[in-house]
Amino acid sequence: MTRREWLALIATAPLLKAAAYEPPTAPVAIAKCASYDEDVAAKLGAMFDQLGGIEKLVRNKTVTIKINMTGAPDLRVQGLALGLTHYTHPKMVGATAYLLGRAGAKRIRFVESAWGTGGPLEDVMLNSGWNVRMLQSAAPGVEFENTNALGKGKRYSTFKVPGSPYMYPAYVLNHAYEETDVFVSLAKLKNHATCGVTLAMKNCFGMTPASIYGDDAGVDEPNEKPTQGRGAVCHEGKRQPSKAAPPELRPNTNHEAEYRIPHVVADLAVARPIHLAIIDGVESIAGGEGPWIGGV
């Protein structure tokens, strides 16, 4: 090899290295929708078409959709309907079910870790003013699961974090996140007091069950009747999760929520990858993720 050839090779090495580690890209579609009075299903269906269709992704498969129902139903912003502010809107939920069913999905399971309860998700939806029967009739095989506890399953599922985990080596979640072929994050576009913004990845922070990661989680066993949030465990690191889950890797590193929550989100994104992200930004709020944040 001549000196000139060697210099040319060295000059291109950084480019080759950068290309080797370039993250994968995915198609994105966006549409303007002035209000939920418009045909939300038509708008969403057109965006699916722009992505190349969803039939290959969902046909004859179980699809699990994580929605955003942050906070108790009785906490409202200026008395407005929850879907107009900080919840995923039920029309978006129904439109998603309809389109997945039309694309051939075998089972459509909507999940959320409902605040302060391990009871049926349908009850929380009814208390939120949602028409559960209408959602059930949007497509064949529609189900609901509250993933804040064990729910309808017989065991929890362990999701190991590949590579170098930030916070926990693995996360123990409701069975619904494992017993699925396709995982969808149906998020609400809004600010977040700690993370800045809530989108598809931050929505999945709510996968962690309060029965294990909650303030009133059992020490040795999960508390299947949780009534509190995850502040002490996930936000502040004041205690470890229930022994049903592995403890934090570096418990004395940082107890600031601004550090901890984004790193938990990053862990979960690789432990339970998202196949399809849908973000509901038709109507929302600014200043925080819900009415409990001052200034919202």
Question: Where are the regions a protein language model picked out?
Answer:
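N-terminal export signals
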Residues: R4-Y21
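Extended, low-polarity segments enriched in aliphatic/aromatic residues
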Residues: Y21-V296
